[in-house]
Amino acid sequence: MEYINFEHNETAAELVRAAYDTPPLAFVHSYGCQQNVNDGERIKGVLVDIGYGLCDKPEDADLILFNTCAVREHAEQRVFGNVGALKGLKEKKRGLMIGLCGCMANQKHVVEKLRKSYPYVDLVFGVDGIDTLPQLIAQKLQKHKRVLMEPAQRPVIVENIPIRRESEFRAWLPIMYGCDNFCTYCIVPYVRGREKSRKPGDILAEFRGLVEAGYKEITLLGQNVNSYGKGLEEQVDFADLLNLLCAVPGDYQIRFMTSHPKDASHKLIDAIAAQPHLCKHLHLPVQCGSDELLKKMNRHYTIGQYMELIEYARKKVPGITFSSDIIVGFPGETEEDFQGTLELVKKVGYMQLFTFIYSKRTGTKAAEMPDPTPRAEKTDRMTRLLKVQDEIAMDLVRQQVGRTVRVLVEGYGRSDGTLSGRLDNNLTVEFAADPALMGSYAQVHLTGARATVLLGELET
C-alpha cells in the first residue's frame, strides 16, 4: 500500500481561469451511502482548490458531476435517467462539462454505456480517482476531448485531499476503504475494491483538527470498520483506534459505521463501555434470522454468535441501543426462515431497522441463485416485519420518557418553534428552543413521544 499526499495542481487552476470569463461554478450531486457523501465533500474541495465555485442548481453550473452509487440496479437506472435529462442543457450551454464518478464508474459496462450512448458526458472516473480530478479537467480543457477513465483500483491512499464539509458541527471521517467480505448479494467489493486502512496517525491528525475546529459529532466511516488495521505495519485494531481518538481532549461524541458482526469483538464493546465520547449505540447488520440463509449470504457468523455479542453488549453497556439491516426475500427464503427473522427482531429489540426487499444485483453470486418466492409474498413478509418493528420501536421510545438527556441539536423539528436533536443512543427528540442552539449540546427532559420521536423540554 502506498500513502501519498494530495498536491495542488496549478496547471489545472490556470486552465480553469483561462477557460471562463467569470469564475466557473460546479454542481456536485452524491447518491448513496455516507462514504459517498464524504467523497462528494472531497470532490467539492478539489474543485474549489482549482478555482471553481459551488452552486445548488445544475442549470447554473459550468461543471455537473454525479457521484454515483452502485448498490442497487434501479439506482443506476435513475442516474442514467438524470444524465439523459442533461442532454438539452448541454446543447444550450456552451462549454458545459458533464461528469460521472463514484461506484458506477468502477464498472466496465457502465463506462462502455456512457462511451457509446451518452456522447455528451465529458468526464468519467472511479472512487479512487478524486485526487486526479484536476488533471482530468485540465486534459479536457486542453484537448477538448472526452476523458473516460477505465475502471481500476489503485493500491494507494491519498491524504490531505481538500474538503468542503456540508455541516459545521457534524463530520464524516473515513478510516478505511473497500471490503473483503464478498457477501453474495453485494456489489461493493467489486466497485470499491479490497480493504485498505488509513494510518492511525493520519486519522488522529484529521480527528484532532475536527475537534479543534469545534465539530461536536464525528462519524468514523468504513464498509467494515471492525476489520480496520489489516495490512498496517502498526499492530492496531478498531478498538485500539477508538481508544486513541477518545484520548483527544474536547467536547464531542463519536459514532461509527458500518460494523460487520463477524469482526465485532468483546474488545470493541469494552471500548464503548469505557469511553464516554463513544455513543452508546451499535449498528450491527444481521440481514436475516436464519443460519442457512446467512451461509448462502456468505456472512460468516451464526445467529447464536450474533446474539452472544448482543447479550455481551447489554451486560457491559447499560442502556445501549441497537439498529440493524434486514433483507426480506433473499433467494430461497422460506416462511420458516422468515419466522426466524421475526423472532430475532423481537429478541434483540432493535431501536431502528433498515429493511429491504431483496433485489437482484447483476454481477453478484446471489443473482444466479434460484429465487422462486413470488414478489407478493415477499411484500407480505415485509409488511409483517414492519408491523412488528414499529411496535417494538414505539415501546422502546416510550421507555425513555422521564429521563433528562444530553442532546446534540441538529436542526428544526416538524412542529413550528421546535428544534430536533439526537440522543447518544440515536433516538430523535423535538423540543421548543432558540435556533441559536443548533450545533451545540443541550440538556432536555423527555416528556412524551409521538410514534418513534421523543418530545421534550429544554432544561435551563
Range-by-range predicted roles:
Residues 95-100, 107-109, 212-335:
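Conserved SAM/AdoMet-binding glycine-rich loop
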